[in-house]
Curated annotation (Swiss-Prot):
It comes from Ruegeria sp. (strain TM1040) (Silicibacter sp.). UreD, UreF and UreG form a complex that acts as a GTP-hydrolysis-dependent molecular chaperone, activating the urease apoprotein by helping to assemble the nickel containing metallocenter of UreC. The UreE protein probably delivers the nickel. Residues 1-41 are annotated as: Disordered. The keyword Chaperone applies. One of its GO terms (cellular component) is cytoplasm. This is Urease accessory protein UreD. Required for maturation of urease via the functional incorporation of the urease nickel metallocenter. The keyword Signal does not apply. Belongs to the UreD family. GO terms for molecular function: nickel cation binding.
Length: 297
């Protein structure tokens, strides 16, 4: 049971443009965005459509062969009652990369209020999409429901990465109370190709340290990443990837082919710094040296 002092000092997300305020209620943020890429007649990849509203914005760095879209949450984070939705499409024969400007922070929520983020991605024939957001950081007493749905054409390619951090280790935060429900689903030509779900209610640290989950580490697991590569190059990537995976007491990873041209990797780490030490070389390789610059800032 949280003490009064905990409630008084718990970090609160500041109000921002896009917040919706009801009488007697704290501000709630709403954000919607849609982006799509296309291949022009001259062969260049360009922005096709763009819609954005509320607290979810998109930026477009230049100087890349693909279209890179960087999402920005102007609310400064997510808390209970917030609602965000993103849709993106890589048009036929185009390449689209999506990332976040910074790590997404999920703050303390009030009782019976849950923040939501829904993402829907589609990849058309001979197109490639890279979904490489930076970490999502879950705070003590946060409540967050997240879903990611991907639709792939028969010959479309996908690199999907979802890093997750459990609490602020440097501040000694222990996630003994939170609600986190996460779902990833990938379909190819209408058929389910991959499905993954995480459900943590209550003491997340106690659940994570159980054998068969993240108990392989010497201490608490406070960071993890899920990676999926759907590409004809998946089998060749697997052999190299296994040489890069850590197998120690501070970080541990595994990778396998779930089906032809479908690679899945999971990596656990003591903290987000250790996670990045293992993850960045992998992402550099799988993105052919074109990982978005915001990952280095």
């Amino acid at each position: 049971m949280p003490q009064a002092a905990d409630i008084a000092t718990a970090p609160q997300r500041p109000s921002a443009p896009g917040d919706v305020v009801a009488a007697g209620q704290p501000p709630r943020a709403r954000g919607r965005a849609h982006v799509s890429s296309k291949r022009r007649d001259d062969g260049a990849v360009a922005l096709d459509t763009l819609h954005q509203s509320g607290a979810l914005k998109l930026l477009f760095p230049t100087g890349r062969p693909d279209l890179e879209a960087v999402t920005v949450n102007t609310a400064g984070g997510i808390t209970g009652g917030d609602d965000f939705a993103l849709t993106a499409k890589a048009g036929a024969q185009s390449q689209l990369t999506l990332t976040t400007q910074a790590a997404e922070r999920v703050y303390r929520a009030q009782p019976h209020q849950t923040g939501q983020m829904t993402t829907r991605l589609s990849v058309e024939p001979q197109a490639r999409l890279r979904w490489v957001p930076q970490e999502t950081i879950l705070f003590q007493h946060s409540a967050f429901r997240r879903s990611l749905h991907v639709e792939l054409a028969d010959d479309a390619e996908l690199l999907l990465v979802e890093p997750l951090v459990f609490g602020r280790v440097a501040m000694g935060e222990h996630l003994s109370a939170l609600r986190f429900h996460d779902q990833i689903q990938i379909r190819r030509a209408g058929r389910i190709l991959f499905r993954d779900a995480i459900r943590l209610d209550g003491d997340a640290m106690a659940q994570l340290k159980r054998p068969g989950i993240a108990g392989v580490l010497s201490g608490p697991c406070t960071a993890m990443v899920t990676l999926v590569l759907a590409s004809p190059g998946a089998e060749a990537a697997l052999a190299w990837l296994r040489t890069q995976l850590p197998a120690g007491k501070e970080a541990y990873g595994g990778a396998s082919l779930l089906a032809p041209n479908l690679l899945h990797m999971r990596l656990l780490a003591r903290d987000s710094f250790v996670l990045r030490q293992s993850l960045l070389p992998i992402l550099d390789k799988l993105t052919e040296g074109s990982l978005p610059r915001c990952w280095r800032l």
